[in-house]
Regions:
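PLD/PLD-like phosphodiesterase catalytic module centered on the HKD motif
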Residues: 1-308
Length: 308
């Protein structure tokens, strides 16, 4: 496992000042270390969505997509986390949502944007998305990795850094938290092309507009829920207002997804680009993939963007 704290963008590739633990830098970045990666976006008003298959987005029913992920999973432990709990109460804990599953050989991690989800989960079956949450668009990223390349304790430590609400827990081991300043953005390398960034709620910062852009000379386009005080426009970041996905055009006000894209990278995660989110924990995964980035950029028809 590789942990880093200082992101540096070199050219169009993300590089990191890293300190390696558990395994060497060579082995944790080897070419056979990619693991499983699934991306999906739900469209507003229903369960219709798209999923990334064979280098293109294809139509999918998002509840069936989620069902297939866990149908054949045989985990020995799991946990769910969400700032909006299934019982309905809203909290000010970490603004992050996900499901972590594991067994003796593998770790699976779903990062999503759906409040109060899942209502039920037993490791291999989960409740469908509730009707109230089908109104808006949502984002999903599922990754799976061998425990040869990744430590469960390191992943749990990364999640705990964001201080979320845990629920539906089973067989969760004790975890020693990070012993460092909360002003660090914690970086966990999941695979050679995927990293996870985690912000503590004690670090009051604009995650998308500042932390995601650090050392970054390229334009980011961000899509996130905006209900509250927004930031003034600034160089290097454009907020998306209209999307066209699978022939459906809708405004970002109908979309609860959280993602951002450059020409070569895609971030999928937790936080919205609003000032109120500075005091919330959260983060997300950055994926280095030209084809995936191009597909996300194709949704931005209203901006007239074309990849060079």
């Amino acid at each position: 496992m590789t942990v880093a704290t200082t992101p540096i963008l070199v050219g169009m590739g993300l590089c990191y000042s890293v300190s390696c633990q558990s395994v060497s830098c060579v082995s944790c970045c080897s070419s056979d270390d990619e693991g499983v990666r699934k991306v999906a976006l739900k469209l507003p008003h229903g369960s219709k969505g798209v999923t990334w298959v064979q280098n293109k987005f294809q139509p999918v029913d998002i509840n069936k997509w989620l069902e297939q992920i866990y149908k054949k999973w045989k985990p020995t432990g799991w946990l769910c986390y969400n700032d909006d709990l299934p019982e309905g109460q809203h909290t000010t804990r970490g603004h992050c949502k996900g499901i972590l599953t594991w067994n003796d050989t593998r770790i699976g991690w779903l990062i999503h944007s759906v409040p109060r989800f899942p209502q039920t989960f037993d490791g291999s079956a989960l409740s469908p998305i509730g009707q109230a949450e089908l109104i808006y668009g949502q984002s999903f990223l599922y990754v799976e990795q061998s425990r040869i390349h990744l430590s469960l304790e390191d992943v749990l430590r990364q999640i705990e850094w964001m201080k979320p609400n845990f629920f539906h827990k089973h067989n969760m081991p004790p975890v020693i938290p990070y012993n460092s300043t909360p002003l660090e953005i914690k970086i966990l390398r999941w695979s050679p092309t995927i990293i996870h960034l985690a912000k503590s709620p004690d670090h009051a910062t604009d995650f998308i507009g500042v932390e995601l852009q650090k050392g970054n000379d390229v334009e980011w386009f961000e899509e996130s829920w905006k209900r509250g005080s927004e930031y003034a426009k600034h160089q290097g970041l454009t907020s998306i207002e209209t999307l066209t996905i699978d022939g459906t055009t809708f405004n970002s006000s109908q979309d609860h997804s959280k993602w951002a894209v450059t020409q070569d990278h895609v971030w999928i995660g937790d936080l919205n680009h609003m000032k109120s989110q500075e005091k919330r924990g959260g983060g997300g995964m950055v994926i280095t993939d030209d084809d995936l980035a191009s597909a996300f950029l194709s949704f931005l028809a209203s901006l007239g963007f074309k990849k060079s």
